[in-house]
Amino acid sequence: MSASNYATERETAEGKVFTVTGGDWDVVVSGTDPINDERIVVNMGPQHPSTHGVLRLVLELEGETVREARSVVGYLHTGIEKNLEFRNWVQGSTFVTRMDYLAPLFNETAYALAVEKLLGIEEQITERATTIRVLMMELNRISSHLVWVATTAMELGAINMMLYGFREREYILEIFELITGLRMNHAYVRPGGVAQDVPDEAIAKIRDFLKLMPKKLEEYEKMLSGQPIWLERTQNVGVLDATGCLALGVTGPVLRSAGLAWDLRKTMPYCGYETYEFDVPTHTDGDVWGRYLVRLAEIRESLKLVEQAVDRLRPGPVMVADRKIAWPAQLAIGVDGMGNSLEHVAKIMGQSMESLIHHFKLVTEGFRVPPGQVYVALEAPRGELGVHAVSDGGTRPYRVHYREPSFVNLQALPAMAEGGLIADVIAGGASLDPVMGGCDR
């Protein structure tokens, strides 16, 4: 830099004279000030214990304060929605169940409701099948919330809570295995009803669980609700008020913890929820603590719903009567071990060529769905789970798109994290309960 920037020049009889003005002193002084705008970019994940290898958070830090947060998704992309376009309508159930793998029965039910709406058979779904759907979804809601409280507590240092939460979830998974044959990814809820009936031994096991779980909830509250460290890590952390939730499209326990009692089971009932008695828990703080209280309260409400559903179960079919849609259901286990009765096998294999042809085409090609498009939404453990299904009149979906609450809710993470401490990012993110299988799908 030239001398004229720091000194004035004038001519005298003795020659050129420079007068130092000290113009650079301000620059020197400001250079010694504390550096207030220096930021560090930190990648939290995907190789991070709390992001489970499937989520990346890019954080700009000023000291320990988060100034900017961005979530990077796509590490668990599976192309499920695209794959649905190459499978028949029934086979779609085996794909959608694998998206949000902690709430598979909600994925299946939303898909089945959309297909049934396209077919125009909503009124033909049997009462027993509808009741079983409610029963299974509410058990699934409890198991999903148990995973949330267990893993969130573990990430904040309460290791014992993780062990207890998964212990009770195991009981529910055993019930699912008894009913569907699988612990996860059931493909149990099908267009037209459910795959098979609920056995009597499963009902007895569910009633035992209804007696056990309220006592376990009291244990959870004793372990966490009055624990000083838990309170410090959750209260006034990850705050998002109702206005912010509505602006970002956030639903589920996060929205209800901000004081808005929005639950699709009440506001837009489906599967006969309007005939059940239950409350919609809310809180007003809009922080991690409020979301914790809402989810524990929702477990209690789901226990009420499960009990009501079990009491409502009456003998009857679990699949629509239309044999152009329904696969053979409620068949006794036969000697072939594949769930076919001897009478059914004898008919399609030895007595009726037409029955064999129909059975073969129904399984391999599937049924046709009239052209049209529908949107169906239900209340999943993480919020509004919506399905936009489009049919061109063929045996396969033209397009199926899921409005996944994990993806939508994750967009609220910057609003919750920015301005807070880096130590609170995990608590705030965990309180959203994102499942990346559903987010990326």
From Swiss-Prot:
Reactions catalysed: a quinone + NADH + 5 H(+)(in) = a quinol + NAD(+) + 4 H(+)(out)
Keyword Methyltransferase attached: no
A GO MF label: NADH:ubiquinone reductase (non-electrogenic) activity
Entry GO CC: plasma membrane
UniProt keyword list: Cell membrane, Membrane, NAD, Quinone, Translocase, Transport
Disulfide bond annotation, renumbered to this chain: none
EC number from the UniProt entry: 7.1.1.-
Task performed by this protein: NDH-1 shuttles electrons from NADH, via FMN and iron-sulfur (Fe-S) centers, to quinones in the respiratory chain. The immediate electron acceptor for the enzyme in this species is believed to be a menaquinone. Couples the redox reaction to proton translocation (for every two electrons transferred, four hydrogen ions are translocated across the cytoplasmic membrane), and thus conserves the redox energy in a proton gradient.
Family label: Belongs to the complex I 49 kDa subunit family.
Subunit annotation: NDH-1 is composed of 14 different subunits. Subunits NuoB, C, D, E, F, and G constitute the peripheral sector of the complex.
Protein name: NADH-quinone oxidoreductase subunit D 1
